[in-house]
From Swiss-Prot:
Protein name: Small ribosomal subunit protein uS2
SUPFAM superfamilies tied to this protein: Ribosomal protein S2
Gene3D superfamilies, alphabetized: Glucose-6-phosphate isomerase like protein, domain 1 (3.40.50.10490), Helix hairpin bin (1.10.287.610)
Organism: Roseiflexus castenholzii (strain DSM 13941 / HLO8)
Classification of source organism: Bacteria, Bacillati, Chloroflexota, Chloroflexia, Chloroflexales
Biological processes per GO annotation: translation
Pfam families documented for this protein: Ribosomal_S2 (PF00318)
Stored CDD domains: RPS2
Molecular-function GO terms, alphabetical: structural constituent of ribosome
GO cellular component, one term: cytosolic small ribosomal subunit
Signal peptide: none
HAMAP family per the UniProt record, alphabetical: Ribosomal_uS2_B (MF_00291_B)
Record key words, sorted: Ribonucleoprotein, Ribosomal protein
Recorded name of the encoding gene: rpsB
Length: 263
């Protein structure tokens, strides 16, 4: 377990964020029973000890995933999640989807990648000033196309291969993303409320997936994990580069010494 994971989140922070409030008892998924502490006034109360355990395991997994050179795709298209998901994914230099999930994003990635490259190509043309050669109407049309494509693909524009993991806010709402990830074998970390099916999720973080403060708290921790993983990878790469440089210098000295001995 990483040092960061050992002091990841306090019970107080979870309570203050409202992470313990589930849905109405009549809207529950019975598979969430192990994660529920009790019910009050017709609302299920989530066991926050299970939340801490789930978040800690998810944190460690994300660290290892990013340290291995993979990206994490943050998914949160519900209104109260969009801003936070975009901010935290960007802070951690990861990918995100905050508009409607486009079918085939994972299962038909070859086609999606063509659209991403098309968008990047358009932006490069604009940056080179090539739009200045067009008529005003045509240039405006291209600008509008870039804006439209960025709204759809902006958060995954740099995705040149499938992500190593998905972090999902509300897998019940993001059912298509869940299905695609399961189909292609990409592990899922998710904020799982009492109306969700935890069996579809690899790393369950049982918590309120509707409250803005709860979403902000958990998403920030996942972003922190991605940053820790990236830092670990960069540190390892630096160590390898130093070792290779040191070995090369030593080999050159040995060759030089042998040459002197022969002379």
């Amino acid at each position: 377990m990483t040092q960061g994971a050992q002091r990841l989140v306090s019970m107080r922070a979870l309570l203050e964020s409202g992470a313990h409030f589930g849905h109405q008892t009549k809207r529950w998924n019975p598979k969430m029973r192990p994660y529920i502490f009790t019910a009050r006034n017709g609302i299920h109360i989530i066991d926050l000890q299970k939340t801490i355990t789930g978040l800690t395991e998810a944190y460690q997994f994300i660290v290892e995933t990013v340290a291995a050179g993979n990206k994490v795709l943050f998914v949160g298209t519900k209104k109260q999640a969009q801003e936070t998901i975009a901010e935290e994914a960007t802070r951690a230099d990861q990918l995100y989807v905050i508009q409607r999930w486009l079918g085939g994003t994972l299962t038909n990635f070859v086609t999606i990648r063509k659209r991403l490259r098309y968008l990047i190509n358009l932006e490069e043309q604009r940056a080179r000033g090539e739009f200045n050669k067009l008529t005003k109407a045509e240039a405006l049309k291209r600008d509008a196309e870039i804006e439209k494509l960025n709204k759809i693909f902006g958060g995954i524009k740099t995705m040149d291969r499938l992500p190593g993991a998905l972090f999902i806010v509300d897998p019940h709402k993001e059912d298509l993303a869940v299905k695609e990830a399961n189909k292609v074998g990409i592990p899922i970390v998710a904020m799982v409320d009492t109306n969700c099916d935890p069996d579809l999720i690899d790393y369950v973080i049982p918590c309120n997936d509707d409250a803005i403060r709860s979403i902000r708290l958990i998403a920030a921790k996942i972003a922190d994990a991605a940053i820790e993983g990236r830092n670990r990878r960069e540190s390892l790469q630096a160590d390898v580069a130093y070792s290779q440089s040191h070995d090369h210098a030593m080999a050159e000295r040995m060759i030089a010494e042998e040459a002197e001995a022969v002379e």
